[in-house]
């Protein structure tokens, strides 16, 4: 669900003996058409194309739902997918608020589903630019050789400059909604604001209506591996 950027990344359109892509969904017709064409090219088959996510999660051929929309939709879609009996792979952040996250946890447990949050920095081959995976560092920390307690300093400087493009802007000039975009459906539970292209798609990250700020967006990429290294997956950063 959501095939504009991350949802249409190469690793989502890769053959896998354990599963196959059967359907895509997006409220932007251009994104949807592009994903269908890519699916035909990669797999030689026609993917089901849905405009409304509710139609996708009730498709009997769908077992796992991948949520790759802006975060203001994550909680609602995850709860509805769990209620529909689907397992869920959700992009970060899990939700915009703690309350939404609790509702997702409750729905997943109540319906006996599997939920996977896609926090992939802990799996990177060049962890924090050190030229290694996270596993050797995990073994070093667990060995106790570094002592305890450990202090970890995190910097988001890597690749930071280009992220200024994501910073939200005030007093945006209203623009006509593109014909291919269902803007009302894109907004969904978010407050209505006049359309401006900077508020949608990749640059939605700069607006509190759709995301939770830098820490929940790119910040979690840096905090999540540290949580794992320190054995704190069941806690929250302070």
What kind of feature is each model-predicted range?
Residues 5, 62, 71, 94, ...:
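Short, flexible loop/turn elements at secondary-structure junctions
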Residues 23-25, 66, 150-153, 187:
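Residues embedded in well-ordered beta-strands within globular domains across many folds
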Residues 1-90, 99-115:
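N-terminal glycine-/serine-/threonine-rich beta1-alpha1-beta2 phosphate-ribose binding loop
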Residues 30, 158, 192-193:
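Active-site/binding-pocket entry motifs
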Residues 87-89, 95-182:
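A contiguous active-site-proximal alpha/beta segment in oxidoreductase catalytic domains
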Residues 20-22, 147-150, 184, 237:
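A short, local hydrophobic-aromatic micro-motif
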């Amino acid at each position: 669900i959501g095939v504009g950027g991350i949802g249409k990344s190469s690793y989502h359109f890769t053959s896998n003996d354990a599963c196959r892509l059967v359907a895509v969904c997006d409220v932007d017709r251009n994104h949807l058409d592009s994903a269908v064409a890519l699916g035909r090219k990669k797999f030689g088959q026609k993917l089901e194309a849905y405009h409304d996510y509710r139609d996708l999660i009730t498709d009997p051929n769908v077992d796992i739902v991948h949520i790759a929309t802006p975060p203001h939709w994550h909680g609602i879609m995850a709860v509805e997918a769990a209620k529909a009996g689907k397992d869920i792979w959700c992009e970060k952040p899990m939700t915009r608020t703690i309350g939404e996250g609790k509702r997702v946890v409750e729905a997943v447990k109540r319906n006996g589903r599997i939920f996977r949050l896609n926090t992939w920095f802990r799996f990177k081959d060049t962890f924090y630019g050190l030229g290694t995976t996270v596993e050797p560092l995990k073994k070093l920390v667990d060995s106790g050789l570094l002592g305890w307690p450990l202090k970890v300093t995190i910097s988001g400087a890597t690749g930071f400059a280009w992220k200024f493009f994501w910073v939200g802007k005030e007093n945006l000039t209203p623009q006509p909604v593109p014909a291919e975009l269902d803007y009302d459906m894109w907004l969904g539970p978010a407050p209505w604001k006049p359309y401006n292209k900077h508020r949608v798609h990749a640059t939605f990250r700069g607006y509190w209506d759709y995301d939770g700020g830098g820490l929940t967006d790119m910040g979690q990429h840096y905090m999540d591996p540290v949580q794992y290294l320190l054995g704190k997956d069941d806690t929250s950063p302070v």
